[in-house]
Regions:
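Nucleotide-activated chemistry modules centered on ATP-dependent adenylation/adenylyltransferase
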Residues: 2-401
Length: 401
């Protein structure tokens, strides 16, 4: 009897990967080993439900790979250090976690001696590149299988296929592709395919339940979130969850991201990311008080590149480690507490309390009184500061420009 080929499928329990389990096991005759790399977006009951679904669909075995701490240490904290928002909007939630999921999946595939590795990405998005590139770099000898992409399947086709094979599910809910993670949740569906539409309220996993106002205090130590409303957290993942629980009930962090995909087309996705938006906003305000002008300028430059490389599947590029070293160094004085006021769908930054606050000095108060220089000092400084510009305009005048 011929031994079946062993394939590891990156499994989320969603429509595409559910189709892949059934298709690869029944149509292609593979032994399908499903694996979910949890970056912190799923609770224990949710993970148990995903495992049950995988086995019902025909998986030979299922593995849950817990990588939330690794994801924080190797990605999230650097995204906070860099205040990274793609196009000034999106905290690259899915973009960042996909690489770590791909790394975990391919390492598991090597561990069990798999012949192939599979994922459910379509041919029109970024994830196909993130998975494929990571697999190719870390295990070039293992075959990559992508049924959804290779067969150019629609969500409607996959739903119909599963129904015909007797698979029951909430197919109405499956009309939306929801990627839930520690650093935000993305929502894709028929509305995100059209520039003039947006997903309906019910498409979002979190619903707005809070009214009025609430004050929130976030404390940072060397750039990392250390306390929420005075409660200290040594586990940074739990600190993020605490902020998410507070902010999500106000609907904070909901938006539409429109960006350029790795493959060169425009893409739209809805998202909700209360914790990332609040943490980044507070962290950025604290940096304004504790970093010098040139620290801020150069950190912003490299952070933009870091976010772009992370989005475009370049996490394993060696320069990323160099950028991380600079981002880490920049945070040595980013310590203090930031207060915010939360309201339904928005928030206000109130102020900062930090012993490293560069406004709290004996040199002067902006727009008020100077204590470290005289009026004549300023007159002389201004005269020298304008020298080159004065020379330029003098030359222009002589040349009648």
């Amino acid at each position: 009897m011929e031994t079946k080929k062993k394939v590891v499928l990156a499994f989320s329990g969603g429509l595409d990967t559910s189709f892949c389990v059934k298709y690869l096991s029944e149509e292609k005759g593979y032994d399908v080993y499903t694996a979910i790399a949890n970056t912190g977006g799923f609770s224990k009951p949710e993970l148990e439900k995903i495992e049950k679904r995988a086995m019902e669909l025909g998986a030979t075995a299922h593995a849950t790979l817990d990588i939330e701490q690794e994801y924080y240490e190797k990605s999230i904290r650097y995204m906070v250090f860099g205040n990274i928002l793609r196009n000034g909007t999106y905290p690259i939630s899915v973009s960042s976690e996909r690489i770590f999921q791909a790394i975990a999946i391919i390492e598991y595939a090597k561990q069990i001696g798999a012949d192939a590795v599979a994922h459910g990405s379509t041919g029109a998005g970024n994830d196909q590149v993130r998975f494929d590139l990571t697999f190719q770099i870390l295990a070039p000898e293992i075959e990559i299988i992508t049924p959804t992409r290779d067969m150019t399947l629609t969500r409607e086709y996959e739903i119909d296929y599963l129904r015909k094979h007797g698979i029951t599910a909430d197919y109405k809910k499956m009309e939306y592709s929801i990627n839930k993670g520690l650093w935000g949740t993305s929502i894709g569906g028929k509305e995100t395919l059209h520039s003039e539409q947006t997903p309906p309220e019910e498409a979002y996993p979190s619903q707005i339940t809070a009214e009025g106002e609430e004050r929130l205090k976030l404390t940072f130590e060397q750039g990392e979130l250390a306390a929420v409303n005075g409660t200290p957290y040594t586990d940074k993942v739990e600190a993020i969850r605490a902020v998410e629980a507070i902010g999500a009930k106000y609907g904070i962090g909901r938006d539409m991201h429109i960006g350029d995909t790795i493959i060169g087309i425009k893409g739209r996705v809805g998202f909700e990311a209360a914790a990332p938006m609040l943490i980044i906003a507070a962290h950025k305000m604290l940096e304004k008080h504790t970093l010098t002008k040139w620290q801020t300028y150069w950190k912003d430059q490299v952070a933009t590149w870091y976010g772009m490389f992370l989005h475009e599947a370049q996490y394993l590029e060696p320069v990323m480690r160099d950028i991380e070293a600079m981002l880490l160094s920049s945070q040595r004085n980013v310590t203090g507490t930031v207060e915010l006021i939360l309201r339904p769908r928005n928030y206000t930054l109130v102020g900062v309390d930090s012993t490293f606050d560069l406004m709290k000095t004996d040199f002067g108060e902006y727009g008020e009184v100077n204590k470290a220089w005289t009026a004549d000092d300023v007159k002389g400084f201004t005269k020298i500061l304008g020298n080159q510009i004065k020379i330029f305009y003098n030359v222009q005048k002589r040349n009648k420009k």
